[in-house]
Amino acid sequence: MRLLWGLAWVFSFCASSLQKPRLLLFSPSVVNLGTPLSVGVQLLDAPPGQEVKGSVFLRNPKGGSCSPKKDFKLSSGDDFVLLSLEVPLEDVRSCGLFDLRRAPYIQLVAQSPWLRNTAFKATETQGVNLLYSSRRGHIFVQTDQPIYNPGQRVRYRVFALDQKMRPSTDFLTITVENSHGLRVLKKEIFTSTSILQDTFTIPDISEPGTWKISARFSDGLESNRSTHFEVKKYVLPNFEVKITPWKPYILMVPSNSDEIQLDIQARYIYGKPVQGVAYTRFALMDEQGKRTFLRGLETQAKLVEGRTHISISKDQFQAALDKINIGVRDLEGLRLYAATAVIESPGGEMEEAELTSWRFVSSAFSLDLSRTKRHLVPGAHFLLQALVREISGSEASNVIVKVSPTLVSGSDSQVLNVQQSTNRIGQVSISFPIPPTVTGLRLLVSAGSLYPMIARLTVQSPPSRGTGFLSIEPLDPRSPRVGDTFILNLQAVGIPAPTFSHYYYMIISRGQIMAMSREARRTVTSVSVLVDHQLAPSFYFVAYFYHQGHPVANSLLINIQPRDCEGKLQLKVVGAKEYHNGDMMKLRIQTDSKALVALGAVDTALYAVGGWSHKPLDMSKVFEVINSYNVGCGPGGGDDAPQVFQDAGLAFSDGDRLTQTREDLSCPKEKKSRQKRNVNFLKALSEKLGQYSSPDAKRCCQDGMTKLPMKRTCEQRAARVPQQACREPFLSCCKFAEDLRRNQTRSQAPLARKVRDMVNLIEEDDILVRTSFPENWLWRVEPVDSSKLLTVRLPDSMTTWEIHGVSLSKSKGLCVAKPTRVRVFRKFHLHLRLPISVRRFEQLELRPVLYNYLNDDKNVSVHVTPVEGLCMAGGGMMAQWVIVPAGSALPVAFSVVPTASTNVPLKLVAKGTLDSSDSVSKILQIEKEGAIHREEIVYNLDPLNNLGQMLEIPGSSDPNIVPEGDFSTFVKVTASEPLETLGSEEALSPGGVASLLRLPGCAEQTMIYLAPTLTASNYLDRTKQWSKLSPETKDHAVHLIQKGHVRIQQFRKKDGSFGAWLHRDSSTWLTAFVLKILSLAQEQVGNSPEKLQETASWLLAQQLGDGSFHDPCPVIHRAMQGGLVGSNETVALTAFVVIALHHGLNVFREGHAKQLKNRVEASITKANSFLGQKASAGLLGAHAAAITAYALTLTKASEDLRNVAHNSLMAMAEETGENLYWGLVLGSQDKVVLRPADPRSPTEPVPQAPALWIETTAYALLHLLLREGKGKMADKAASWLTHQGNFHGAFRSTQDTVVTLDALSAYWIASHTTEEKALKVTLSSMGRNGLKTHVLHLNNHQVKGLEEELKFSLGSTISVKVEGNSKGTLKILRTYNVLDMKNTTCQDLQIEVKVTDAVEYAWSAYEDYEDDYNMPATDDPSVPLQPVTPLQLFEGRRSRRRREAPKVAEERESRVHYTVCIWRNGKLGLSGMAIADITLLSGFHALRADLEKLTSLSDRYVSHFETDGPHVLLYFDSVPTTRECVGFGASQEVVVGLVQPASAVLYDYYSPDHKCSVFYAAPTKSQLLATLCSGDVCQCAEGKCPRLLRSLERRVEDKDGYRMRFACYYHQVEYGFTVKVLREDGRAAFRFFESKITQVLHFRTDTMASIGQTRNFLSRTSCRLRLEPNKEYLIMGMDGETSDNKGDPQYLLDSNTWIEEMPSEQMCKSTRHRAACFQLKDFLMEFSSRGCQV
């Protein structure tokens, strides 16, 4: 009996303990700092009438409160409450959270005396650990277009919102990463309107790839959001090609007999169909994107209404597979690749498209069961939720889904069969009952009937533990919409006699508990949830109860059907559905609240060139960001209550149980089984590529197969491959491909052209001229209150614009409008292409294409509007009448000849009726004949020196000057060297810094964007002179520094080092240079110190045991590392690195950086010891001595070391008067530079020293300033450096400019004074119009007018008078075009450029290098053409870029091949980088694919290339001693005749004056030299040409004295000679006739003219005039402005020149010529003796 009573007592005690009072604590498992945290507190099983008081708060696990306390009061009747806590950002540091980075947890604590007194706790606190995150709010980033060219400006917006999606004003941190993932820009900006707008420029040297703009709240590291955009070179297409397969998949089941079918569509961007031919090819593509060509499937087809259809039968496809030994079963996982090139018939333009998503599959569908719960409730219904998509990714509607569940109950099982069709969005929800005894469920699900997709899923019942289960069943299994009431039924299952009275539930969305409530228990309890915007896009419904002291819980994830935003934003174009270019468009913006609306319009043509991969911001992206705050994992449910809470994103504690502490923000990934694929197909994909297994070997093989744009044997190519492992596959595959393409040929067919006649016209003034063609516009933010009507002018592009809008409202948050499209189109319009540039008197053929989409044929008049400087038919007013058939296009040809020396606006007009007129205006870029020559001279102005108060500057008399050119002398005078150099646009503006150095560049030269501006900013900061400049100057300077920083990051490697090119290994010297400059720029660019610390760490790893530094890959120009070889080179490099590390010390801060700082300081000390030893040995050259002395002084090395280095340096100084410099010393590498002669008097120009001398003296000046301050020696060194600057303030190259500006800035800061000094300079020159005088009043503090730039005649002597008490500088810049290059030094460097016709080159190469689409475009594409060979079609995409295909048949003749050869004199010690700058023949552009082959393959021939207008720049690591040639193709899109020779220059990168310049011409007998003009166009072009008179032959008598009237009245000639022509010579675009004077009739300036002397007479090659040798002529005209190499005048023969062939003695003896001969002799006698009596 006692035993029974005892057992009863124990049982009652346990029961009471299970039902003991509890405090339940709920919250999201993640705390976002600075944002509210919802906390649910519930009192459970408390006796009636009992009241519990307490508080909740957040604290550091180590102690210390992190949030204010929130009180609560609970009772049995009011037993739960939802509170809000927050960790203020300002308290994060004080509560010690930042010290817990490795364990980022915070504790949620409930505190109440009740816990200890009544709940039997040891303490009065109960808590749970939460993960904390600095993420808060929402950020969205938007760019103005999805794709950019390198060099383009990117406009972007950042929208900042708080946790509730409302506008937030805060500091934002913006970062930009390039395609290599390296950060190139970082800035912090405060946004006051929640919409930040800013811009940055992509460096022009950027490699193709995906860039990223990221934004975050500055105090929230994890709030980062980003957007991506593409960077690549592209041209906006005129039309778009689309490939649409009939099915988005290809079934690879053996029984499938369907044909493979696809449609090709080509439409102009404005929506109209394209006429032309489509060429299509196919390949198999694996997961890595590698393609294997399917021979025999290539097709060509005519487009009908812009469409064509391609069908491949099963047998055709199988035959293609058989050729490469591939079976149908091997196709799984592969894709069928299709590429189409369309050539339009009217204009011959080509566009391409490719299809890469066409998969081989075993089923047409994919099946997603991720929304199906993994736990079932025995005795309740189970809900299977599936999403069925087509292989393309779109929802599959009305697809039968069959479910065969196997119910497992112990060892028994039962199979059911259920089926249902998917709804319109591909969803299906199937519910079926589960018997109470079932413990598991095996699901077999199939989608589709014929070839179904099958998925399997196993579902288990959670262990009951005797507490039963909770079933949650939605009344309607479909996803609700915002505004719906969603009903869920709750039922306790497996509990015989429930002991609880209520179900409790929570709604969790966006990482917060949105609601907490309870519902009284009934047999079936229904809960209604009103779905509002705050629950979108998904929420968890979590319900629970306690039974016998144990929690029972379940949850369900409910996805809300996508809908528009909380507010309203609609964009609607009012009025016409279609607009004309230039029309005023009305855009209606409608909102439902006061909002800011950010707009933007994008040309949809950008999507055609790859922009679709980066879609614009839309609501799906917005919901994706919102949903990212949902910290729940899975579809709901769990093994037990804590797991249910945890998977729903909750942290939970009831005193006895708690959820596991969350480790990170992400969910654990579900393991997926992956079927093994048959790997045998890899060998079968390609007989050749399959021989190589490693990716590197495969790449080498592919490189070998790729054709070069020049002739090289495979053995020659392989010899250039540096890696031995790469050489064998490269050679083998090269020979393999060479055999395949050996005998390929092509045919061509002419393009027929039509011209027709006549109609009634409208006035030309009524035709809108199209001139504006942006890629995006309407980038603006508009305040809108409910509605606003914007009226904007549409750009001139004929395209479809997509208008985007994003609104931000304080009451409704962010909303993204559905884009609206506006088609801008003229049913009749013209399209015109112009060449990059042409030269004067070259003949240009314009070929505008007229497009007529009207229903009627149109009679149209087409003409070019008259403009001065352009010869056209009828002076431009003669029109061509054509009939453009309805629905077609017609090209029209015009010949024009530019005669102006400046750019000409060219306006083309098509005049018809009101609906058939159009006009386009473009600028024709005109280049002058010959090549540009620059000459710079510097004079020192010192009025205090009596000998220097007067000086004369002689004019230039270069015999090579092009006549009638713009040749002038520019004079710049300044009295303020510091402000002129460092306060001018040259140092503080983008255009100015570009003018400092006119060189293009690699990584080192890129630093010129940073260094001068940094130096200038430092000078103006230190001397407080920003106020003397315009207010925006400092902003410009900061922008320029940031731009330079972005640019240099393109060369950064992942380890922090830098190389001259991305493909080149890192350089110690260059990395040190960048470290130094970026350390100084830290404040302006906001660069991460960690990045610079990586750079410094890399440098430390390059230090050797003796303290010196070595360079694993020296910069290309070795001389710039110290000017000397051997030990001097090592010394200079070590000193350079020491200087860089010293400047980098300021970026080493707390933590790890302190250790790195100690390492850097130790490294500097070690290096200084090495430098001191070398300086003590006394064997250093001047440059190494100077940089060593500066490094030791800068780093404050021991005094002994500094003194030794100083004495060694001063022993090498050269002192001349007021100047001190360091020049050539024994051991210098630069033996070709001679010492400049000291000026004999102050009136002579300052001798210009080489770059190395300037850099050496600059380092010496920096050393002297640190050692002695502003002393005499520093004054003299600064004086010498000051007068070495060029016209724009720079010096010879990058390094000497950077170091010298640094040195002079330091000197000018030390010598800055407020004392004002004045300088008066008087310049006078005698010109054609008499004496020209300028008086300049300057002072040393002038800003506006700190310098005067004047223009004088090139040949005039300039007299200069100097007065005042201030020194100054006078700089001369002469620029003019020269006829030939005979005056340039080509003894050391040599360059040769040869241009050959493409056909000639192809035959000589024994193969057709114009592979792929070089096919004729005809008016009737159905005319049989020679088919394209498989290899040619397949190689097409690799060998050509967009718009590099021939446009019409005859343009094949306008394709040429360039061969560029370079070499140097073997005795020349030049080992540095050189640049070949080739100016292309007019109208040509280089084929970019050819240039890329020279730089990107394993056998690299060129380090880098750039194209700039008509220029192609090729970078060579070095110039070989033997002749080395590279080649590339060029295409002339616009026909040009009488093409003039162009120039090419090879120059040393660091000494640009060390160069070789040559001219080259078009191929002889080429159509490029043919005459295109006819009739009056030729007459106009020759209007300035001289005419040869043969008066005697035409029996014209001089009765009225027309010779005398011409000489004295019409023109009043300035010279008159009879001459005998000796020889003819061609130079550039001129013919030279060297002639001997036989009689002097008259002269004005040619005072030395006498009988027997020779003179040169010049005529343009475009003129027909030919003077025959050994014949005598009478020539009279105007004086020339040029002289020959003897200083004698040269005369240009033009329309104002009298040229008459003198009759022979025999002719004058004849009777019929006797009178005329006497008249001629009388004129010669009278004019020579009396001249003009006027």
From Swiss-Prot:
**UniProt key word Phosphoprotein:** yes
Q: How does it assemble?
A: In absence of complement activation, circulates in blood as a disulfide-linked trimer of an alpha, beta and gamma chain.
Organism name? Mus musculus
Query: Which lineage ranks, top first, belong to the organism behind this chain?
Result: Eukaryota, Metazoa, Chordata, Craniata, Vertebrata
* Anaphylatoxin-like domain segment(s): 700-734
- Keyword terms: Cell projection, Cleavage on pair of basic residues, Complement pathway, Disulfide bond, Glycoprotein, Immunity, Inflammatory response, Innate immunity, Phosphoprotein, Secreted, Signal, Sulfation, Synapse, Thioester bond
Q: Which positions form S-S bridges?
A: 66-95, 633-667, 700-726, 701-733, 714-734, 1461-1525, 1573-1578, 1585-1663, 1608-1732, 1708-1717
* Underlying gene: C4a
Name-wise, this protein is Complement C4-A
Where on the tree of life does the source sit, at the highest rank?
A: Eukaryota
Which molecular function GO terms apply here?
Answer: endopeptidase inhibitor activity
Q: State one Pfam family annotation.
A: MG3
Residue positions, PTM Sulfotyrosine: 1409
